[in-house]
Amino acid sequence: PKLVAEKIRENIARTEVNKEIVILEKAPKIAIYSPKNKQPWDDAVTLALSYSEIPYDVIYDSEVLNNILPMYDWLHLHHEDFTGQYGKFYSAFKNASWYIQQKKEFERDARKLGYSKVSELKLDVAKKIKDYIFSGGFLFAMCSATDSYDIALSSENLDICHNVFDYDPIDSDIN
């Protein structure tokens, strides 16, 4: 076992490898940003954390908007879509009952939180995450979360959502 650990350390120490050993002085408090309802795909991170018995909390839009992020050291994003376009599953699942139900829930939750569109809600959530990162929080994003987070922030003040998502046209001057 020591031989394996030494090989790993040697590999990480190579200058051409973009890695670093980090000593954790305390166990990080982890939040998983995810809707409360069960989705038809698995999140490998929550599966690994659960299997490893590493504690984490599931938080979502209302908690983020209520400034809960500073309580956590690490935030994990997975299949989330911060653009208001309901993720990458539209083309394959737009007629699936779970997709239709999820879209209705997102729209209901946005209205409940005072937003007329899901894209407006998700932009504010993305801004809160940005503030969290700038304050020293660690973000681990994968899958569609990485792209949609950046797209949402960079498209502030533009309507980039097709009317199938938000019932009005996209801005005509997008380039």
Where are these regions (language model features)?
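Histidine (H) residue identity feature
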Residues: 11, 76-79, 162
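Hydrophobic targeting/anchoring helices
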Residues: 1-43, 52-54
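Helical hinge/lid and interdomain linker segments adjacent to catalytic or ligand-binding clefts
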Residues: 31, 35-146, 150-152
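Surface-exposed patches in mature extracellular/periplasmic domains of secreted proteins
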Residues: 3, 59-62, 162-166
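An acidic, glycine-rich "communication" segment
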Residues: 8, 142-175
